[in-house]
Amino acid sequence: MFMTKNENDHGVNTFSSEGRLFQVEYATEAMKLGSTVIGIQTKEGVVLAVEKRISSPLMLGSSIEKIIEIDDHIGAAVSGLTADARTLIDNARLEAQNHRFMYDEPINVEVVAQAISDLSLRFGEGSRKKKVMSRPFGVALLIAGVDETGPRLFQTDPSGMFIEFYAKATGAGTEAAQSILHEKYNKSMTLREAEILALSTLKQVMEEKLNSKNVEVALVTVEKKKFEIMDTAFIENLIGEIKEELI
C-alpha cells in the first residue's frame, strides 16, 4: 500500500511512489534561497566570496559569519540555514583534529568533504536522544583548501553528494552566477584574477550594492597553506580594482 503524498512529505526516510524524497527536495530549495556563494580554484590557491544579507540598519554586519575555518588549511562558505551548517562544520573540525592527532599530519580536503556528506545522510537515524537531525540539513557548503595534491574546491548539498569544481556558485543567484563563471573562468587565471572574478560575479547577482560590509572573502594559497578570512581593507581594495576595470 502506497503512502499518500502528505505522508511522503513528512516521512524523511520514505521514498514516494515516484522514487522521490520530498524532505531532501525541500532542503535543497532552502539551500537555493540562501546567500550567493562563489568559489574559484586556481593553481595558486582558492578564493571564496559570499554575500552577507544585512536585513536591517540596526544589524551589525560583522556578526554575520558566512565563511568559517575548519582547519588551518581548510574552510567553508555557507549557503542556506547557518544553524545547520554549524553542526556539519563542528563535525568536520572534529574529524580534522582527530586526523591530526592520530597521524600527525593535516587532513586531506576530500576527506573533510566526504565526512560532511556522510553526516548529511544521517538525518532521522538512531534513537531520539542520539539523532543528529530529525530532517535533512538545509545547507550547501563550498569547501576550499590546499593539501598535498594542491588547491581543492568541493561542494556538498543536502542529498549527501560532494563534487569537486574548478569554479562553482551556489545559493540564490546560482544560475546567473554560474553562467558568468562558465563564460569567464579559465584554468590559467591567477589568484588575483579569480578574486576579481568572484567579487564582480557577486556584484552582478546581488540585489544590494556591493561594499566591504555586505560581502565576505577568504583565501587559501599553495604558498602559505593557510585559510585566511580577509579584512575590509582587502575587500575595499578589490572593489576598487573592479571599478577600474569597468571604466
From Swiss-Prot:
Main location group: cytoplasm
Membrane-spanning parts: none
Signal peptide annotation: none
Subcellular location: Cytoplasm; Nucleus
CDD domains: proteasome_alpha_type_5
Keywords, in A-Z order: Cytoplasm, Nucleus, Proteasome
GO biological processes: proteasome-mediated ubiquitin-dependent protein catabolic process
Gene3D superfamilies, sorted: Glutamine Phosphoribosylpyrophosphate, subunit 1, domain 1
Pfam families: Proteasome (PF00227), Proteasome_A_N (PF10584)
A cellular-component GO term for this protein: nucleus
Keyword Cytoplasm assigned: yes
NCBIfam families: PRK03996.1
Family affiliation: Belongs to the peptidase T1A family.
Its biological purpose: The proteasome is a multicatalytic proteinase complex which is characterized by its ability to cleave peptides with Arg, Phe, Tyr, Leu, and Glu adjacent to the leaving group at neutral or slightly basic pH. The proteasome has an ATP-dependent proteolytic activity.
Subunit architecture: The 26S proteasome consists of a 20S proteasome core and two 19S regulatory subunits. The 20S proteasome core is composed of 28 subunits that are arranged in four stacked rings, resulting in a barrel-shaped structure. The two end rings are each formed by seven alpha subunits, and the two central rings are each formed by seven beta subunits. The catalytic chamber with the active sites is on the inside of the barrel.
UniProt protein name: Proteasome subunit alpha type-5
